[in-house]
């Protein structure tokens, strides 16, 4: 089952986090068919250099699109969704590091349940050092719990979502 990974980066992103994030996407046990990276406005030279290095090293995997000015995460992602080649899209933030099995686990859920339209998961958060976990963000897992939770706030950790 082929899918796209959608990411948006802007000038304030930490270059080291971007590298760690891209490495974690590339080292998945199930590979994405494409990584759609939206440059949300002009970036620093260091961020541009990292994106160019990965685009060159993994030619054909990365599809990079540039917005002339920063429009914010929501609009940048909407722009990116329109450029994804596949109906199934995995979201990633450029400061997130995912476990190697994330895409495999999610794709398997879509294979098992043909009516599934979205799945996500918990996150472990860090402040500066990815090896030092500062907390966890757990979300409801059942449909009933999701519907109840959604009355108060978003029941999904958006950066963990894979959806059609």
Please report, for each region that a protein language model flagged, where it lies by residue.
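Nucleotide-sugar donor-binding/catalytic module of glycosyltransferases
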Residues: 1-164
